[in-house]
């Protein structure tokens, strides 16, 4: 009886072990950590230009003036670790200085922000090993649409949420709304990763694979935020070594860790489809054998 149970358990865990081996093999072949380092470098280079472009878009629409403040606080509170307040203060100073630039400098900011999107596109298609390239004009249109519509849609969602919370009938649902708002960062991360894994690759990605990979990445991202904040709070070695400049290495490490999570979710999405194809091929070979 015990031997039968052990055999069944071993038989059930064998596919999972094979899938994990395939996942590790792809991570090693794709040099995932190196890709994450490249994206972290480009992200840090593009951070201020990207934020400057986003805030400039909000400034162009007076209806989003109040929402932009809420969105700013939401981003720094939920997508950066414990030092979000310090980083926010520095970035806002940099953005304020960028407002004094000429038209040529503004174009440079936009190009730098688009460079980040191109790097993300290149890294994800490397993981999917896609050889098909989009037309340059189409790629530019997609990047520009994400750069312009993304912040506006986020601002619109926050405006709608604020409006619903202000309604009288919503006062009886405060508990439910509070619970929903607590998981809102997780849902937003999940949807963002799902769109990233579904749209960016130039080959077709099965929707269920993208959903699973995005969900794992969202969970790791939320857990990583809490773990990183706990580490910074409990083991303040960076503050002891770097003093006032501690925010710089903390931001570097957090951005690198974030891209590791994003690319790991992409690897999981790819491996799910590849493992399914390999399994179907193996079953087909068994059926063809006399």
Curated annotation (Swiss-Prot):
UniProt name for this protein: UPF0761 membrane protein YihY
Q: Taking the first listed entry, what is the main subcellular location of this protein, grouped into a coarse class? A: membrane
**PANTHER family (alphabetical):** INNER MEMBRANE PROTEIN YHJD, UPF0761 MEMBRANE PROTEIN YIHY
Give the residue spans that cross the bilayer: 39-61, 101-120, 141-163, 183-205, 212-234, 244-266
Source organism (scientific name)? Escherichia coli (strain K12)
Q: Ribosomal protein among the record's keywords?
A: no
* Amino-acid biosynthesis keyword on record: no
Example of a GO cellular component annotation carried by this entry: plasma membrane
* Cytoplasmic face of the membrane: 1-38, 121-140, 206-211, 267-290
Q: Which UniProt keywords apply?
A: Cell inner membrane, Cell membrane, Membrane, Transmembrane, Transmembrane helix
Write down the membrane topology: Multi-pass membrane protein
Q: Enumerate the Periplasmic topological stretches.
A: 62-100, 164-182, 235-243
Gene from which this protein is expressed: yihY
Localization recorded for this chain is: Cell inner membrane
Question: According to its UniProt record, which protein family does this protein belong to?
Answer: Belongs to the UPF0761 family.
State the source organism's domain of life.
Bacteria
């Amino acid at each position: 009886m015990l031997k039968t149970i052990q055999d069944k358990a071993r038989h059930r865990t064998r596919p999972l072990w094979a899938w994990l081996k395939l996942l590790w093999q792809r991570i090693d072949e794709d040099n995932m950590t190196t890709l994450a380092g490249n994206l972290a470098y480009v992200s840090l280079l593009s951070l201020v230009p990207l934020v400057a472009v986003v805030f400039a878009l909000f400034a162009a629409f007076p209806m989003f003036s109040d929402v932009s403040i809420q969105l700013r606080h939401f981003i720094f509170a939920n997508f950066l670790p414990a030092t979000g307040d310090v980083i926010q203060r520095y970035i806002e100073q940099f953005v304020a200085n960028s407002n004094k630039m000429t038209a040529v400098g503004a174009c440079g900011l936009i190009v730098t922000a688009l460079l980040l999107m191109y790097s993300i596109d290149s890294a994800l298609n490397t993981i999917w090993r896609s050889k098909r390239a989009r037309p340059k004009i189409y790629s530019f249109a997609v990047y520009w649409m994400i750069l312009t519509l993304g912040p506006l849609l986020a601002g619109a969602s926050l405006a709608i949420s604020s409006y619903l919370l202000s309604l009288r009938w919503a006062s009886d649902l405060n508990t439910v709304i509070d619970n929903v708002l607590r998981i809102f960062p997780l849902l937003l991360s999940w949807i963002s990763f799902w769109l990233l894994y579904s749209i960016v690759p130039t080959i077709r990605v099965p929707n269920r694979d993208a959903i699973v990979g995005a969900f794992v990445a969202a969970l790791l991202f939320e857990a990583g935020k809490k773990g990183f904040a706990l580490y910074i709070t409990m083991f303040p070695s960076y503050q002891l070594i770097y003093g006032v400049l501690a925010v710089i290495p903390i931001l570097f490490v957090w951005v690198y860790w974030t891209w590791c999570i994003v690319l790991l979710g992409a690897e999981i999405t790819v491996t799910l489809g590849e493992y399914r194809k390999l399994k179907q091929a193996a079953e087909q070979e068994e059926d063809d054998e006399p």
